[in-house]
Amino acid sequence: MSLLVIGATGTLGRQIVRRALDEGYEVSCLVRNLRKAYFLKEWGAELLYGDLSLPETLPTNLTKITAIIDASTARPSDPYKAEKIDLEGKIALVEAAKVAGIKRFVFFSVLNAQNYRHLPLVNLKCRMEEYLQTSELEYTTFQLSGFFQGLISQYAIPILEKQTIWITGEYTKINYIDTNDIAKFAVRSLSLNGTIKRTIPLVGLKSWNSEEIIQLCERLSGQKANITKIPLQLLVFFKYLTGFFEWTTNISERLAFAEVLNARQDITSEMASTYSQFGFEPNDITSLESYMQDYFGRILRRLKELSDERERTL
């Protein structure tokens, strides 16, 4: 089977590429910056130029592709509204897949998306889910909650660098998952007929709130976090303020997620049936504790090595 990965240079996309290559798939990657994506070519993937914000750049000759995994999303820094990528670009991609005769399509959405449809970014995910459901494609939609990898910049690095961590004192717990594990499920789904035209929740082993994650990072790093709590109302104010300017629209839409954290409704799902369907066990899934332990272990070892090198040069 030959696979086309969209968003292949991103946090999730690159793990999907690596996993698919390891399992023997022929992998092509649709990228908008060939130079930045060169590492994917070194891994063994083929690079194709294309930009979802410019549908006319999508390749017209995709006949050798048998499946598409779309891990793309708009960035906060993009100079256009998220809809240009997360809806219009994806619809153009699906239409290109139909023309090429590609049936299999894997998409990533947000867990319990219908509950948060008032949020602009989630609404785009809902609309894309609905579009796929009315299409002729053999789609699989994975609904995700959050990535371990995003917690590094949010909590781990600020603690190590003694920077302030801003939290809202939220009540909601989120069941984060490692992108490596998401990649395992995504690639496995291509060989399971039972996943066709299905929406599947995909979460980790345990739900966490911000304070619990900070406590874990403090214990593993041996350092105390500098925490500042800010009222949720202040973030809501910034959301509306940034919404006034076109160049801050994406930032405003992401600030809207802060309102979810005070909803007192945990973002999680039961996974037993999913494990059974995919042939995985809970032991096959990485826990946040082991992920963070590995991260801090590597960083602290490196810091010790640098300290030893400085002492030897004195």
From Swiss-Prot:
Keyword Chloroplast: yes
EC id: 1.-.-.-
Gene3D superfamilies: NAD(P)-binding Rossmann-like Domain
Entry superkingdom: Eukaryota
Any one GO biological process: photosynthesis
Record bears the keyword Coiled coil: no
CDD domains (UniProt xref): SDR_a5
GO cellular component: chloroplast; photosystem II
Record GO terms (molecular function): oxidoreductase activity
Enzyme class: oxidoreductase
Keywords: Chloroplast, Oxidoreductase, Photosynthesis, Photosystem II, Plastid
Compartments reported by the entry: Plastid, Chloroplast
Family that this chain belongs to: Belongs to the NmrA-type oxidoreductase family. Ycf39 subfamily.
Task performed by this protein: Involved in assembly of photosystem II.
Name of protein: Photosystem II assembly factor Ycf39
Organism: Guillardia theta (Cryptophyte)
